[in-house]
């Protein structure tokens, strides 16, 4: 990671959307980089989680690290939001798969956690598909999706962090144009 003071300065200098992008977020071994996520994918459930832990330990360790106190402290310093708490149940999170033709309408995420009395404050997206070149850019927008602030290519090991507010409109409204045997994660 960047030193926290430099990362925070850059984060604060971004648009009012307040986002930050890290390339090469985590160190993944080459054998986990080569689309292995496709071979074990099923909708997120306990069995999939257990297979992820065994088949892709670096990805699993990343998920654990994102919930660690050390990483939460980094996010607190980066964003200036104190008292962050990990969502260990991945409510609204986890690993998402999007196939050919898929898209995600522009939207803002819920702010209040559906089962706990907590506010959702930050989104972290980490892209896991190598050699991506099939649309599906993450669009960050303002004014209810009318003004695109940024369009981010979902390249492998790129992380995007942004505040979760009613105004943090995001999505990938342009459908993916990938071969049927490839999905975006």
Label the model's feature ranges.
Residues 1, 22-23, 85-89, 94, ...:
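A structural signal for short, well-ordered beta-strand segments and their strand-loop junctions
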Residues 1-78:
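Non-heme Fe(II)/2-oxoglutarate
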Residues 2-20, 95-107, 128-130:
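Charged, low-complexity, helix/coiled-coil-prone segments
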Residues 5, 9, 66, 70, ...:
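Short, well-structured alpha-helical interface segments that form or flank functional binding sites
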Residues 18-19, 82-85, 130-134:
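Proline-centered turn/helix-capping motifs that create local helix->coil transitions or kinks
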Residues 51-118:
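Non-heme Fe(II) oxygenase catalytic core, chiefly the N-lobe of the double-stranded beta-helix
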Residues 96-97, 101-102, 106-122, 127-185:
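Catalytic core of Fe(II)/2-oxoglutarate
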